[in-house]
Amino acid sequence: MDCSGYVRTVLLQHDMIIPRDASQQAVTGQRIEIAKDFSNLQPGDLVFFGRVADGKERVGHVAFYLGNKEFIHCLGLVERSSFDPTAPNYDAYNTGRMLFAARVLPYINKEKGLNTTDQNPYYQANFE
């Protein structure tokens, strides 16, 4: 399973539907520029990683923020990592390519592409 599939699966287990790819997930909810101390993030926020090319952000990875500078993500295996350089699970690679975060949970059923199954036309048509 890849990162965006992991995010999608976890949310679907809680009856929430989110777009399929990390780049699509990155344009949902409220964008958050991450504070140096991570104080403006909340557990459940999505953190996006990638690179800036030609002045444009290229999202290539997504994770759930857990709090206390930790995040959980998947690249084949689910892994709990940290942005804190003093932590044993510090992830220097992903810390170096962190772009921004997004708060999506308050926007479920309020924004196109973020639904619960009972509000999604596909699920209504095929599973009732």
What are these regions (language model features)?
Residues 1-5, 49, 65:
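Acidic helix/loop microenvironments that form the catalytic cleft of cell-wall polysaccharide enzymes
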Residues 1-42:
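Catalytic cysteine-centered active-site loop
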Residues 34-35, 59-128:
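Aromatic- and glycine-rich peptidoglycan recognition patches
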Residues 44-47:
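Generic structural signal for buried aliphatic residues
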